[in-house]
Every structure is written in structure tokens, then in C-alpha cells.
UniProtKB/Swiss-Prot annotation:
Native organism: Methanocaldococcus jannaschii (strain ATCC 43067 / DSM 2661 / JAL-1 / JCM 10045 / NBRC 100440)
Protein name, UniProt field: Putative type I restriction enzyme MjaIXP endonuclease subunit
EC numbers for this chain: 3.1.21.3
Any single biological process term in GO: DNA restriction-modification system
Family: Belongs to the HsdR family.
Function: The restriction (R) subunit of a type I restriction enzyme that recognizes 5'-CCAN(5)GTR-3' and cleaves a random distance away. The R subunit is required for both nuclease and ATPase activities, but not for modification. After locating a non-methylated recognition site, the enzyme complex serves as a molecular motor that translocates DNA in an ATP-dependent manner until a collision occurs that triggers cleavage.
Domain Helicase C-terminal per the UniProt entry, residue ranges: 551-731
């Protein structure tokens, strides 16, 4: 069951105390989330001010366009930097508030450098030129900083005068807006995603506020996420910890991902957990200092990265300061599932560890087991740490370790090897602040090479990161690195939306080859040798028999044809990329030739290493320089590029992220973590990608099962889901949906005339329109069926249900069209992740139902006319009639209220009353239809009163507004009519001007004219004139909404 808004409101009382609960009851429900957040932050020691108190009038800032609270800022930096004079503090303020760069991201980066490193200040003291850095935040003495939370903080548009935006909540540290919150009420029809969209809108209008923000938070009370100002929605994360990454228990998750938690025995919402975890003062300061990096965008840590790095650094300090034996210098192992940002976690670790005083500027040596991985990791780090070194040889590594006082070095593990068995690896240094950090630390050779590491650097400490589970049967990894520091498994990552699920499909099973070879004792090439094509080829002789079969014309013909047919059908549903994994370079080249012969083959490339002076001539087009490979990788990663498919052998199977990659075809036997790493290429989050698909042409499922048998059942289950499971669930859901339409023949609906089809859909609509619960259930089932269909495509089982699914989609669209906002919200939420896919594959055609057909047949009739209402009421399917009438009235009232709320607001309230009476079964369907028809007639009559008075629609709106003021000295309605006409006539001249609503000079003229008209009619009270003229102007903006 979904978590209810009522449950949220109930828990608010638990979270914020009885006093606040009583106060919350008095508040508009729209502000419940906001006020709960304020109270939680006050409990955490934050000061509070309403935004109306942080204005120029209160001397908090110079203008509404300013985002930094000037006086608080100057007071804080003088407190943190006692040597700072008032004059110099003002100079710092001007520097921070005048960041000169046209690019929003660059302004954010420049400010973050000021925030962390201080503001460079050049000044003269006693005639001597000096340079010092001014701290904006005291990261060491937290209590020296001022923490302030403010709601409804009003900021003027950056590019336009007189228009304002008010973020729901802003957290200031020392007068600087560090975090911005947007909320939606849990009882509204909007969600946290809508709050995210609000951020994006406000960011365009008031960028001068958002350029300082490091954290954006969105919440509807039930779902809460945070991200950076440059994050897309799929990079907004949950926060699921208070003091560590495992101290919060999930007690309830609904269909939309909304979560309830338990912490120390008490229930909490997601918003409370985020505030208690991330916005605890000590945590927030630490987060700002150590867990934000700028690359092309601002990247901020997830909760599991934050707590993991904190623990890893604490253990590092203990190891360096107190580790007397090799066992004491084992820091531990970080296991974070594939696709969850392991490289970024390592980067945050480096950033934090390097500045720890206890470590005395340590030397961090990052080790990988392949040149490709070494280069990838180095490239990630070098954009942040320009001083990072990369060892190209054993001798260079030894020299760097001897001479480098501290910093970062990258190398492959093989550089700790020996050229011959008789050679001894030399002693390098006895420093104790060298940290060996292994990437993917479960290769068997770490145990052997660790001996050389210990001899060379006897006092080094050891830390490991891995993306696949460690084999508990092989204790060598734990003997070298220690036990787990943190584990972030794939099931959590999927629940948090950090990765997408992976599905498995076996195709051309008759061609599967590995069963007879599965027991061959071969090591993965990527684990055993350096990046040398000749050496690789000699080892690959083990695969000779397999390769020979795969090079036959029959095999290549069948596989190449099937790959292209399968992938092109996938592209019909969602755009993206594919990767084909082959056993050898020869198979890769031959398969490329066959694939490019296929009709409608996409643009494709082979990615492999080689040497043109030694390799066969047909290899040459596929052997690229380093720069050419970089350009090819860039092209493949670009979702908009024409390069849709690559064929690989070993390269790009680990550490290579292509979020738009959604399909992998395997023609290569793989084992253990190498297989787990390879298939994880397709689990990256990208827009509305529903999942990744592994297509097996060789039999890796058996190998995967054997390889993962040593891991927990959870790890095996979460790694991959067989497409057969999806097919079975699709069939079950299909049967569920068809059960709504028993004895209705819809199978040949595409052959029906428009009139017959409209009658059929209304008949089908009647079956699912009994009540809101039935409608919700139907909508959920159809959307679930669509998702399963998309995941299963292009499996043959999907062909038979495609037409039926399109019919179900038509009925679902009718339900959403003629139903309450809540049902529309459910549909929007559930389909959010597949929105762009639907139109490509299974979108229902635009249906002209009975109501739409009636409007087409009799376009001269108003939808509120007696004749039209009579025609609608004659339709035999009364649930449909009821919903259509509600839709007509809702739409009509909404349009009329926008222009004349005074006259038509009462009808909106009446409509809601009728709907509520029906909901609680006070009236029947027939009685409800009768009341709705009567209400429609009253609305029509109210609208026609203007004609009887000789007033246009616009004049009537002004007329109603003027009559609504009880103390206006106008008792003669004829005089009011005259004023309304004069106002409308005056406005007709101004509205012709382009952008009249935005031009300040025109607005001033209009307001002045309105005041003159009112004074001319005998209104003397100037405050009343101001009030009425302001209201009339706002009315005019709605009336003339052009």
C-alpha cells in the first residue's frame, strides 16, 4: 500500500512534538513540510528568520537582488579572521558578490574555490603590500560559524525588475546561501519531482542565489532527495543514514519509492533522516569541505560515499599512527556495487585523506591490474588533482615512491613484480604514511605481489575498493587488506535509483558453445597479462577450438543477422547503444564484416588493440592510436551520435561508463568478477532507460551461476534477472488487465469504424469506472504491463499482445482524462521513467470517444447548452457520463475562474461538494448526473448575466471585483458598470503593446490610469484606491492572458 499523506501528518507530530503538532494543525497543509523542516533544523541548533525579515528594509542586504546577507557575512568573516578590518571585509564581500564569468557552472566553481581555500586579499599595511587568504567558513571551529534557516526568502529576478522568486527554504552559513529547499505538500497532487522542476525554473530566474548553493533539496514529505545545482533528476539521491550508512532501518517502501524509516526505535520520514544526517552542523561543514568536487559539473557525494570515506579515513589514521604489525596496517575493503560511483568514492577519499594533519601529507599509491584501468582512473583524478603522477615503468614507480613527499601516484600492480624469479624487489622506504589503495582487490595475484609490496614499503597501510563481492572461500584478499569497511549492495542501489536492473536473454541456444569448454582451466586474460597483443594471442590459443567454430560462415551469418534484427527492434522502443563482446580479435573483425553486410545495420566500430606492422591487413582499419581511441570513446558515449554499436574483445569491459548503453551481446566465455563487471556496463542510469539487457549467444548463464555460487543468494539474485521471469510476469499482468473486459470483443478494434470504436471504448471504460479504487488499480496494471512489455521487447511473446496493449492504453488515457487529479498523478508518477519510450512503441492513437464525436458532429453547440447536456445524458454508460460531466465542469470552471474568480469560485466549491457526496455514497450515480446537469445550467446562467447587463466577459470581471469591496462608496450598480467599461476600454489600448506585463513604465502608467478612474468616481480613501487599483491590475493580467 502507498504511504498515505495522513500517515505523514500523523508522524509530523511524533517528529516535532505535541506543541508543534497543535500549531501545524492550524497551518495551511501546503506549509506542513516546510514547517516540519524548520523545526527539525531549529532542533539541530540553527537560528530561524522568516524571509520577510531578511530584506533591505531590515538592513540584511542592500537590495532584493542580492543573495548574500551582507551584514551577517561581514560580521562572520571578521569573527573568523580577527585581523580583518571593516574596509577589508567590505572588499571581500564585493569580491564574493561580483564573480565575473558568464557561465553559471564556472561561477559556482570559482565560488567553491573561495569557500574552501579562502578569498585572496591583497592590501597594504603600514605601506607594505601584503597578500592573505580570508576564510569564509571556519571548518575547524564549527561554533564560530552562524547557521541560519529562512523560509520564503524573496529574491528579485536577475534580468528583470519588479519580479521575484521565493524558494521555500534557504540555509545560510555566515550569510551565504549554502542550501536551497523546495517542498510540495503530501496532500497535493505534486511530488518531489515537481519540486525539482521548481528549482530549475528558479535557477534560471535568480541564478545569483543558486550560484552559491552547494546542495539542493526536494521533498513532498514522503519522498526526499538532494543533489547539486547542476544535477539532473536521475542524479538526485536519497540520504539513508544519521551517524553511519547502516544505522537506519527501512520499515516501509511504497510503489513510488517513498520510504519510512526507523532510527533508534522511532519512526521518521525521509526528510527527517536527511536533515538529521546531512544537515547536522558537523556533517554539513565536513560535507562542504571534503565531499564536493568540480569537474564539468558540480559533483556531490551520496550518503554511502560520505559515511564510507569518513570511516576509511578514520581507519587510515589509526593504521598510520598505531599500526605496528602488517595486520594492524590493514585498513579494510570498500565494496560498492557496480555503477554506484566507486571511482568518485576513491576521489573523495583522496581529497579528505591528503589534508589530515595526523597523516602528515601522505602518499597515496593507487594500483590497478590493467593499463586501461590505470589510465581511466588517472583521467578521473587528474581533472581534480593536477599534481597526480602516473608511473610508466617499474623504475619510475620506485623513483617516485622514494622521492615524492606526499600526493598521489598511479601504477599497475605488475610494476611491483619482478623481471625474473631470481630477482629481489628492492627496499624503497620505511615511511609509515604511504597508503596502498587497490582497485578491484580480489584478483588472486594480490596475495603474491603483496609480499613485494611489504618488502619495498614495509610500513605501508593497505586499503581496497571493489565493485563485486569478495570470495569468502579465498581469504587471501582479507589477509592483505582486512575486512569490510562498507558494503553498498546492488539491491540498495536499485531501490535508490542509483543503477537500473539487468535482464538476461538467451538467444540462438542451439549455437551455445561453452558447455563443452566450461571446465577448461584458463585464467581471464585481463587478469593475467599486460596490454600486449602478441602475449594475449599466445594465451588465447586455449580458445582456438571455440574460435574455429565461431568463424564458420554458418555461425557468423546466423549471429550477425540475429544481432541486427534484435537491436533494431530494441531501437524502436528506446534509443541507445549496444556492445558486442567477442572471444578474439579475429572473431571481432569477421563479425564486423558480416554485421555491416546486414540491411539496416547501424554505424558500428571494432575496439581492439593491435600492431599494424605485425597484425593481418584486415585488422588495420580497427587498430587506432591512443588519440583516435579517445575520440571513438567520446563518440560512443554521446547519446546523439550515429555510432550505435561497438564490438570489443577485452577493452572497455571495465571502468568504461556509457550511461546510454542498454544492450550487450556476449560471444565470449567469461568468469567470476570479470563477467560481473562486464555485464554491469548496462546498469547505468540514463534518462528513462528501464533496464539493461544481456543477450547470451554462448552460454554465460551457466558460467555466471557457477562463478557466483560462492556468493550470497542475494548477490546472485540481484545481479541479473532472466528475461523469462519478465515474460511470465508480463503474461500474468496481461491476464489481470484482460479480466476487466470479459465478454467484450476488442480483438479486432483496429478494423472498426471511428463511430463503432468510440462506442466500444466507452463500453470498456464502463467496466473500469465503477469507483476511484478500480480506476487506480486498472491504471497501475496497464502501466506495469507496459513496462514489462518494454523490457521484454523484442521477445516473440510480446508480438501477440501489442494490439491489445494499445487498446488498453486507449482506455487508460480515457480514465486519466476524465478522472480526478489523484489518478492523473498516479499515472504520471508510474510512467515517469518510461515517458519518452511510450510514444515510440505502444502509445494509443488519439481516440475520438463519444463525447469528442458529439462535439465534432455539433460544433455549434456549447458544452453547457441544454441540447448538448441532454445528448450526453442519453448515453447508456452512466459511469462514463458521470466522469465526462465532471471533466466538462472542471475544465469550464477552471477557465472561467482564471478570469473571474469572484463569480465562479463558488461553482468550484459546489462541484467538489457533489463529488464528495457521491464518494461517501450519499447520492447514486443517476442522482449525481442530475446534480451535475443542474450545476452546469447555473454556471451557464452566471456567465450569461454579463450579456444581460451589456458587459463583455472582461468588463463583467472588473464589475464583479468592484462590487466585492464592502466599503466602496458606489451603491449605484449602473455607475459600477460604467467604471468597468471604462477600465476595459483603457486596458484595450495598453494590451496591444508587446510585453506590457513586463515593462515597468507601462505598468506604472496603467496603475496611474486606474487610480484616476477611481478618484474621478468619488473614491477618496487613498489606501483603498491603492488596494483596488492593485487588484484591478492583477485581474487585468489574468483577463488579458496573452
Amino acid at each position: 500500500m502507498p504511504i498515505s499523506a495522513n500517515k505523514y501528518f500523523l508522524l509530523v507530530g511524533v517528529f516535532i512534538g505535541d506543541k508543534m503538532k497543535k500549531e501545524a494543525a492550524k497551518l495551511n497543509e501546503d506549509y506542513v513540510v516546510e514547517n516540519a523542516a524548520i523545526q527539525r533544523l531549529k532542533n539541530l541548533g540553527y537560528s530561524y528568520k522568516h524571509g520577510s525579515e531578511l530584506t533591505p528594509e531590515y538592513n540584511e542586504r542592500e537590495s532584493y537582488r542580492d543573495a548574500i546577507l551582507k551584514n551577517r557575512f561581514i560580521k562572520a568573516i571578521k569573527n573568523i579572521n580577527p585581523w580583518l578590518t571593516e574596509e577589508l571585509a567590505l572588499k571581500v564581500y564585493k569580491t564574493v558578490t561580483n564573480i565575473d564569468n558568464p557561465d553559471f557552472n564556472m561561477r559556482g566553481k570559482i565560488f567553491y574555490e573561495m569557500l574552501i581555500n579562502g578569498v585572496k586579499l591583497e592590501f597594504k599595511e603600514n605601506g607594505e603590500k601584503k597578500t592573505r587568504f580570508v576564510k569564509l567558513i571556519d571548518f575547524e571551529n564549527i561554533n564560530k560559524n552562524e547557521f541560519l534557516v529562512a523560509n520564503q526568502f524573496e529574491v528579485e529576478y536577475y534580468y528583470e525588475n519588479g519580479r521575484f522568486r521565493r524558494p521555500d527554504l534557504v540555509v545560510f552559513i555566515n550569510g551565504i546561501p549554502i542550501a536551497i529547499f523546495e517542498f510540495k505538500s503530501p496532500k497535493s497532487n505534486q511530488t518531489a519531482k515537481d519540486a525539482f522542476n521548481d528549482h530549475k525554473t528558479k535557477m534560471k530566474d535568480i541564478p545569483q542565489l543558486y550560484q552559491y548553493a552547494q546542495i539542493l533539496v526536494v521533498s513532498d514529505g514522503l519522498e526526499t532527495k538532494y543533489g547539486s545545482p547542476t544535477s539532473d533528476w536521475d542524479r538526485f539521491f536519497v540520504w539513508e543514514g544519521v551517524e553511519s550508512d547502516d544505522d537506519v532501518e527501512v520499515i516501509e517502501v511504497d510503489n513510488y519509492g517513498n520510504t519510512m524509516y526507523k532510527y533508534k526505535g522511532n519512526p521518521y520520514t525521509s526528510l527527517d533522516i536527511l536533515l538529521m544526517g546531512l544537515f547536522k552542523k558537523e556533517h554539513l561543514i565536513e560535507f562542504l569541505e571534503d565531499f564536493i568536487i568540480h569537474d564539468k559539473k558540480k559533483i556531490i557525494a551520496t550518503y554511502y560515499q560520505f559515511y564510507t570515506v569518513k570511516k576509511a579515513v578514520d581507519r587510515t589514521i589509526k593504521s598510520v599512527l598505531y599500526g605496528e604489525t602488517p595486520e594492524d596496517r590493514r585498513i579494510g575493503i570498500v565494496w560498492h556495487a557496480q555503477g554506484t560511483g566507486k571511482s568518485i568514492t576513491m576521489l573523495f577519499y583522496a581529497k579528505k585523506a591528503l589534508k589530515q594533519k595526523e597523516l602528515n601529507y601522505p602518499l597515496l599509491v593507487f594500483l590497478t591490474d590493467r593499463l586501461e584501468l590505470d589510465e581511466q582512473l588517472y583521467n578521473v583524478f587528474s581533472s581534480v588533482f593536477s599534481e597526480a603522477e602516473r608511473a610508466e615503468s617499474i623504475a619510475e614507480l620506485q623513483e617516485l615512491i622514494k622521492k615524492t613527499p606526499g600526493g598521489i601516484i598511479f601504477a599497475t600492480i605488475q610494476k611491483f613484480g619482478r623481471k625474473s624469479k631470481d630477482e629481489h624487489y628492492p627496499f624503497l622506504t620505511d615511511r609509515n604514511n604511504i597508503i596502498i589503495i587497490a582497485d578491484e582487490a580480489h584478483r588472486s595475484h594480490y596475495g603474491t605481489l603483496a609480499q613485494n609490496l611489504r618488502k619495498a614499503i614495509p610500513n605501508a597501510s593497505f586499503l581496497a575498493f571493489t565493485a563485486t563481492p569478495i570470495d569468502y572461500k579465498d581469504r587471501s584478499t582479507f589477509l592483505v587488506f582486512g575486512d569490510y569497511i562498507s558494503a553498498y549492495p546492488i539491491d540498495k542501489a536499485k531501490r535508490h535509483g542509483v543503477v537500473v536492473p539487468i535482464y538476461y536473454e538467451a538467444r540462438l541456444v542451439e549455437l551455445h558453445l561453452t558447455n563443452e569448454f566450461i571446465d577448461l582451466e584458463f585464467d581471464e586474460i585481463s587478469e593475467r597479462v599486460a596490454n600486449d597483443p602478441e602475449t594475449k594471442e599466445s594465451i588465447k590459443e586455449v580458445f582456438a577450438k571455440l574460435e574455429k567454430i565461431m568463424l564458420t560462415e554458418d555461425y557468423l551469418s546466423k549471429v550477425s543477422k540475429d544481432i541486427i534484427e534484435h537491436f533494431n527492434k530494441r531501437l524502436q522502443d528506446f534509443d541507445g547503444k549496444a556492445m558486442v563482446v567477442t572471444i578474439s580479435r579475429k572473431v571481432a573483425v569477421e563479425l564486423y564484416k558480416w554485421i555491416t553486410k546486414q540491411p539496416n545495420a547501424p554505424k558500428i566500430a571494432v575496439v581492439m588493440s593491435g600492431n599494424k606492422s605485425k597484425d593481418p591487413e584486415d585488422f588495420h582499419p580497427h587498430i587506432r592510436t591512443k588519440k583516435e581511441l579517445e575520440n571513438l570513446a567520446k563518440e560512443f558515449k554521446d547519446p546523439e551520435s550515429d555510432l550505435k554499436m561497438v564490438i570489443v574483445v577485452d577493452m572497455w569491459l571495465t571502468g568504461f561508463d556509457v550511461p546510454c548503453l542498454h544492450t550487450m551481446y556476449f560471444l565470449k566465455p567469461m568468469k567470476n568478477h570479470s563477467l560481473a563487471q562486464a555485464i554491469a556496463r548496462v546498469n547505468r542510469v540514463f534518462k528513462d532507460k528501464p533496464g539493461g539487457l544481456i543477450v547470451d549467444y554462448i552460454g554465460i548463464a551457466d558460467d555466471l551461476s557457477k562463478s557466483l555460487s560462492k556468493y550470497s543468494s542475494e548477490a546472485r539474485k540481484d545481479l541479473m534477472t532472466d528475461i523469462k521471469v519478465v515474460i511470465e510476469e508480463m503474461k500474468r499482468r496481461y491476464e489481470k488487465v484482460t479480466s476487466y473486459f470479459k465478454n467484450i470483443n476488442y480483438k479486432d478494434w483496429k478494423k472498426l469504424s471511428s463511430e463503432d470504436l468510440s462506442l466500444l471504448t466507452v463500453k470498456a471504460y464502463q467496466r473500469v469506472a465503477k469507483d476511484d479504487n478500480t480506476k487506480k488499480e486498472f491504471v497501475r496494471n496497464v502501466i506495469a504491463l507496459k513496462k514489462l512489455y518494454l523490457l521484454a521487447r523484442p521477445h516473440p511473446e510480446t508480438i501477440g499482445i501489442k494490439d491489445d496493449l494499445e487498446f488498453f492504453e486507449m482506455i487508460k488515457k480515457m480514465i486519466v482524462k476524465y478522472s480526478t487529479k489523484k489518478i492523473r498523478e498516479i499515472s504520471q508518477d508510474l510512467e515517469n521513467d518510461i515517458q519518452s519510450l511510450i510514444s515510440k512503441s505502444i502509445s494509443a492513437k488519439e481516440l475520438v470517444d463519444v463525447f469528442e464525436m458529439l462535439k465534432k458532429e455539433k460544433p455549434e453547440l456549447s458544452v453547457l447548452s441544454d441540447e448538448f447536456l441532454s445528448e450526453i445524458a442519453k448515453i447508456e454508460y452512466k459511469d462514463y457520463v458521470r466522469d465526462v460531466l465532471i471533466k466538462i465542469l472542471n475544465d469550464d470552471i477552471r477557465v472561467r475562474m482564471a478570469k473571474n474568480p469572484i463569480r465562479f469560485k463558488k461553482f468550484s466549491e459546489r462541484l467538489n461538494e457533489v463529488i464528495e457526496k457521491y464518494r461517501i455514497k450519499v447520492i447514486t450515480t443517476a442522482e449525481m448526473i442530475e446534480e451535475l446537469v443542474n450545476l452546469a445550467k447555473e454556471i451557464r446562467k452566471a456567465a450569461e448575466e454579463g450579456k444581460e447587463l451589456g458587459l463583455t466577459e472582461e468588463e463583467l470581471a472588473f464589475y464583479d471585483l468592484l462590487l466585492s469591496y464592502p466599503n466602496i462608496p458606489l451603491t449605484d450598480k449602473k455607475r459600477v458598470e460604467k467604471i468597468a467599461k471604462e477600465i476595459a476600454r483603457m486596458m484595450s489600448g495598453y494590451i496591444k503593446a508587446r510585453d506590457w506585463k513586463k515593462k515597468k513604465n507601462l505598468q506604472s502608467k496603467i496603475r496611474a490610469k486606474l487610480k484616476i478612474i477611481l478618484m474621478k468616481e468619488g473614491i477618496k480613501d487613498y489606501s483603498l484606491i491603492n488596494k483596488i487599483s492593485d487588484d484591478l491590475f492583477e485581474y487585468a493580467k489574468n483577463i488579458y492572458a496573452i
